[in-house]
Amino acid sequence: MEIDYYDYEKLLEKAYEELPENVKHHKSRFEVPGALVTIEGNKTIIENFKDIAEALNRDPQHLLKFLLREIATAGTLEGKRVVLQGRFTPYLIANKLKKYIKEYVICPVCGSPDTKIIKRDRFYFLKCEACGAETPIQHL
């Protein structure tokens, strides 16, 4: 069976019209601000923590909980920044943020960053707003 090229174009246009507005006009590039890390004595401060959480479209508490578990330390959210107990390199913080993005932000099906975390019964899912896929994720 041969598919007519013009029928394909019409179907493609129709599919595009069905997409949600936030998907049609999203930025082609996903940009997250780099962590501004300062070390003061035995504390590490991420100055722009809230900005990072907003760029990822995630609750700062969720991101903080992940970060604290990953680097096995205590920390607090103070306004727009986070204060961590201990000295941690900017490289380590950046790697942990990349891991968070891979596990809790980017859709594993289509690669879109337009996702949200939803809870159904006792389980958590990463729901993609671009392709509609729901992927189970580990609860923090």
Swiss-Prot record:
This is Translation initiation factor 2 subunit beta. SUPFAM superfamilies: Translation initiation factor 2 beta, aIF2beta, N-terminal domain, Zinc-binding domain of translation initiation factor 2 beta. Heterotrimer composed of an alpha, a beta and a gamma chain. It holds the Pfam family eIF-5_eIF-2B. GO terms for molecular function: translation initiation factor activity. HAMAP family: eIF_2_beta. InterPro entries: IF2/IF5, TIF2_bsu_arc, Transl_init_fac_IF2/IF5_dom, Transl_init_fac_IF2/IF5_N, Transl_init_fac_IF2/IF5_Zn-bd. SMART domains: eIF2B_5 (SM00653). eIF-2 functions in the early steps of protein synthesis by forming a ternary complex with GTP and initiator tRNA. Belongs to the eIF-2-beta/eIF-5 family. PANTHER family: EUKARYOTIC TRANSLATION INITIATION FACTOR (PTHR23001), EUKARYOTIC TRANSLATION INITIATION FACTOR 2 SUBUNIT 2 (PTHR23001:SF3). Keywords: Initiation factor, Protein biosynthesis.
